[in-house]
Amino acid sequence: MENLLAATNNSVKYMERRKFITTTLKASTALTLMNVPAMVKAAGILNSDLTIQNIIDLILKEIPEAPFKETVDTIKSGNAANKVTGIVTTMFATVDVIREAIKLKANFIIAHEPTFYNHLDDVKWVENNKVVAQKQELLAKNNITVWRFHDYWHTYKPDGIFYGVIKKLDWQNYLRPDKGITLPATTLKNIILHLKSKLGIAHVRVIGDLSKTCKKIALMPGAAGGNIQVSIAEKFTPDLLIVGELQEWETAEYIRDAGLLGNNISLIVLGHTESEEP
């Protein structure tokens, strides 16, 4: 019996196929990376002839205007024509995740972020890269196909990553139509404690007075970049900007100076993976 798998950066969790499908079907209206088997079941083609390309095509049917002409969501390793023996979903297709997939006889890894250390997965990004070559060999030797699921997932309505984080934080009722968040008034410290508890984060980075009251929140998982982060801060004037990752000399210094100039804005940096993995 095949396994359908859900992998994190540090571990792989798995369930027997039928149990997994039953569980995910209950949440099929809120499409997540874990819902791939739910879509397969719904399409009525769950059988031994299912190929990797079949899985990809099913996912793309759920994405507005897919397939895109330009996207990083491409095959990074392997052959999409291969029959599926098992599926791993993960933030990063790390060597640990690949080895777990091998042990579990899963030949298809769906990763949200790059496999070869740069946004375009250009394996010639650094010439004669020994680590890239070793990773390629590990994947090829075990006939594992890696496909990135990034642009499509962020294009899904609502954005799959953003919705997942909002749901994990129990902030659905505070979400505004413009994607801003209006919380009951609370302190920056209390929000930090809530984030750490709900997301399982040991440490966050903060700029701001921990006793300051916050209501209006801008949540930006991942690494949108300094220009977009600062633009959101300027446009929506939130009390608190929560981001996944940033350039320290861009957004962080902007927030620091904004506060020193009397503007009521604080910053929390969660970490890229921590902000998107839920």
Task: Locate the predicted segments by residue.
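N-terminal secretory signal peptides
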Residues: 1-19
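Active-site catalytic microenvironments in core metabolic enzymes, especially phosphate/sugar-handling
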Residues: 16-278
